[in-house]
Regions:
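Positively charged, proline/Ser/Thr-rich regional signature most characteristic
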Residues: 1-38, 114-190, 238-239
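Terminal peptide-recognition signature
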Residues: 4, 60, 78, 157, ...
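Solvent-exposed loop/turn segments at secondary-structure junctions
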Residues: 10-13, 48-51, 75-77, 129-133, ...
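Short, charged, surface-exposed secondary-structure boundary motifs
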Residues: 14-17, 78-81, 169, 229-232
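Thiolate-centered catalytic microenvironments shared by cysteine-dependent enzyme domains
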Residues: 21-119, 136-137, 152, 202, ...
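C-terminal soluble interaction/assembly domains
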Residues: 180, 190-226, 230-239
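Generic beta-sheet signal
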Residues: 42, 122, 193-195
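Short hydrophobic segments within beta-strands
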Residues: 45, 125-127, 196
Length: 239
């Protein structure tokens, strides 16, 4: 899209050495480099119907960025509608964005998830495909290079595949449809909801839908997801 700046999820939001989210300082530098200030409005979009765009959205919110928005419909939809395209690489004056300390209320870690299995006021939402959830496959066909060695799901998790939330063109279903879908599976706003997937990107998509479209007050993304859970000896697994 003309004027868009590349923000590479592998380079700019993941610490490849630790396989963890980047530090506050690294995010500050990355966003300053592309001209971002604290009062900038960020609009994110990407491929795979915005998997990684919502992952970036979650990271930005984790470090306190105020005005982040998701384009409804991914890059593919933009192409298909014959909208303006560019090969130019824009340059911007370095920005002055300053990140906040991490907002730990939107992130879940493995030990916390393990402790909360079976809790009546919390619910785990596995947003992977049904075959991943049941242990028939270890990773999605779209992104199969990182996965847990063991198949299955976290005990007690309900399966709501991320693609049940979107139409074929990548646009999101209505809030009415989404509310009906989640409440039919007992994923209700009175509970703390923890989302997870394979490596964190699809979990961020569902986190975005629940928190920002449906207004659930307490939603966390377990970004370690199955890559961490399914590679850790002794973790409980169901199929």
């Amino acid at each position: 899209i003309p004027g868009a700046v590349l923000f590479d999820w592998k380079r700019d939001i993941i610490d490849s050495t630790k396989r963890d989210v980047i530090s506050k300082q690294v995010l500050e530098d990355s966003l300053q480099r592309i001209g971002v200030n604290n009062d900038t409005t960020l609009i994110v979009y990407g491929d795979f119907k915005n998997w990684f765009a919502t992952f970036a959205f979650w990271i930005f919110k984790y470090y306190g960025f105020k005005d982040v928005r998701l384009m409804n419909g991914s890059r593919k939809k933009w192409f298909e509608e014959d909208r303006p395209l560019s090969l130019d690489i824009p340059s911007y004056t370095r920005g002055n964005f300053k990140a906040s300390d991490p907002d730990k209320s939107i992130r879940a870690f493995m030990n916390y998830v393990k402790e909360e299995i079976g809790s009546q006021d919390k619910i785990l939402v596995d947003v992977r495909t049904n075959d991943e959830y049941n242990g028939k496959t270890l990773a999605p066909t779209e992104y199969s290079t990182e996965y847990g060695q063991m198949g299955g799901h976290i005990p007690g998790a309900v399966n709501v595949p991320w693609n049940t939330m979107v139409y074929e063109d990548g646009t999101l279903k209505s809030a009415v449809e989404l509310k009906k879908l989640y409440e039919s599976l007992n994923v209700t706003p009175d509970k703390e909801v923890i989302t997870y997937c394979g490596i964190g990107e699809r979990a961020a998509y569902t986190w975005f839908v629940l928190k920002y479209l449906l207004g659930y007050p307490n939603v966390k993304s377990y970004d370690g997801s199955w890559l961490e859970w399914g590679n850790t000896i002794g973790n409980p697994i169901e199929k």
